[in-house]
Amino acid sequence: METQLSNGPTCNNTANGPTTVNNNCSSPVDSGNTEDSKTNLIDNYLPQNMTQEELKSLFGSIGEIESCKLVRDKITGQSLGYGFVNYIDPKDAEKAINTLNGLRLQTKTIKVSYARPSSASIRDANLYVSGLPKTMTQKELEQLFSQYGRIITSRILVDQVTGISRGVGFIRFDKRIEAEEAIKGLNGQKPPGATEPITVKFANNPSQKTNQAILSQLYQSPNRRYPGPLAQQAQRFRLDNLLNMAYGVKRFSPMTIDGMTSLAGINIPGHPGTGWCIFVYNLAPDADESILWQMFGPFGAVTNVKVIRDFNTNKCKGFGFVTMTNYDEAAMAIASLNGYRLGDRVLQVSFKTNKTHKA
């Protein structure tokens, strides 16, 4: 779904990963009227449960604050793990950096630095990376991408139960041009330890603002159903827990979905050897790849998406395909999204078979 990201925190790189990665970040507030503002601070790696009041109280202990903003997800309201504090006196801002930078709060080591003014060169520099080797560490991910520019934050998504990598990561560069170079250099390449090429793409697409309302509905709509053989009384999951594992987001509708044991041992023809191919039917004419990336991303590593378009009109013909690397994640995505109402259409989602529509 990882993912429509807006520009996030701008700080020096640290070994401590970001507190969260999300598809619908608010853009950072402007750091002031001048490029050399010495009163506005950006505060990174804040504890996930820290409130704006607590942020204000912490920094207010240093000096008088003009404004304070904890940046939250536009859809869920969840903290994105960073914020901005603007002091009245530049000396207080300097003191806050000297006092609070490196402070250990819960499991996080916060980073406090001067904020930069917002500009086109530093916006939209977030990358979504899929197909990573499960053994790759966050440090190795940064080493792979650091040759293209300064990395602001990085993260590899892991299963919170097993701690095993989900094969998906995010890299936020200092500048968009650096992210563009990383895409040119690494997309479709095999990093050390990988058996398949990785996919590197922008995690955000500013032109897809019209999709946010639809995707918000996907996250929050209580109108869900789970037809077909998946609806067995097997191990039960909660959709909000699933997405919490993927992105740390908890404010999803508490719909239950049934487990995958009913699919165990079944020989499904949707596996071509390079991933599990999923057929998505009844898409709207204006549907594009962005919708599919953002719908399926939180369930696991997505290596490819394709919307089938009419040759003459370039409009979606009503169906598309998604390829995921892991069977369990693909099956969970099908269980969650089959029968989902997207806009005024009910989606049909299944493993691709020999009888499935052809491109």
Swiss-Prot record:
GO terms assigned for molecular function: RNA binding
InterPro entries: ELAD_HU_SF, HuB_RRM2, HuB_RRM3, Hud_Sxl_RNA, Nucleotide-bd_a/b_plait_sf, RBD_domain_sf, RRM_dom
Residues in RRM domain copies: 39-117, 125-205, 276-354
SS bond partners: none
Residue span of region Disordered: 1-39
Keywords assigned: Phosphoprotein, Repeat, RNA-binding
CDD domains: RRM2_HuB, RRM3_HuB
Protein family: Belongs to the RRM elav family.
The protein's name in its UniProt record: ELAV-like protein 2
Lineage: Eukaryota, Metazoa, Chordata, Craniata, Vertebrata
Gene for this chain: Elavl2
